[in-house]
Amino acid sequence: MTSLSWITLLAFALSVAFCLGFRGLAREWHLIDIPDARKRHDGNVPLCGGIAIFLSFSAATFLAFGVSGHANAMALLPGLVLILVAGVLDDRFNLPVAPRLAIQLLAAFLIIAITGLTQTYLGLASDGIETAAASTPEMLIQVLTGPLFLIIALAFIVGLVNAVNMSDGVDGLAGSASAAAFFWLAVIGFGIGEHRLGLQALALAAACLGFLVFNMRHRWRARASLFLGDGGSTFLGAALAGFILILASGTAAVAFPVLIWIVIVPVIDTLSLIVRRMSVRRSPFSPDRQHLHHLLMDAGLSCGQTAVAVMALNLLAGAIAYIAIRFDIPVWPMLLALAVPAAAHTLFVLRMTRGARPIVTASMAEANPTTKPNITYPGATS
């Protein structure tokens, strides 16, 4: 059996085993999701999926490579641990937004510092530029370095952490979408010769699939028996951001704007939500039911169909990134083409929300008891 096969199978098997083992412990630790006005699921569901995915990925990686795996990917672990712990604490104690963001920023800084990332490849240079001009505006758009790189990298990590977290609202959605993204990161890693990084990304995809045995709705499972929790969704977002930044650096770097395609679905949905919430003077982190998955369910899809649809969109977006890399499509067209999914998302949101009554949050409903909240949807898990 090849290393590719056994590492993938090991990560999957460990994930299933850890999910089974931690379900009882999660109840003892009070890591459970209790149904309320916003969460419409049956019974108290353990929030230990993220812990299981992290442990299975880490164990499979160390058993396969020891400490000789891809140096930057191994260096992600301290920051990922901090993100995971902060998310688990949020699951347990419902932390305020400010300390959550502070911990996420610290974890993002650890990821950048320990991996030694100092630049990201943009690939936006024009052909035919004279060498003498390469030290001024050319270098600015070809390779991003210095304080500007640090600011953008921090924003990217924290942004993707929260984008994946916000997308975790339907059984199987965040896990399957993340598995699709890690799959394409693995394929791209193998394609540019980063085999250890590719194996580690594939191990994470397999660990997500092991979790989906308990979280994805299918013929033999009517509803999820295990949730990712904030610890899991934020960990997956940080891991995706870290792998993308690693692939966008080094001697065989892939252009960052091309890699963005792999996570474009949660990125566009989150940016759209932030703009819409702030336009009505609401916090970007306030809950509502205006996410893409909510609107897909409003359009008539079931919970399971919604998860599959979003996963398919992620697979398609990742395939576009791979095709661009495989056939050396210039970066500028790929960057400009990001307007297509953004426009499609905007048109879909406008169509689904046209004529809809204003969204009412739980806090607004408490302030005015005569107002009926409009924040839930059958089948949504968070």
Predicted features and spans:
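C-terminal membrane-associated helical module and adjoining short loops/tails
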Residues: 246-382
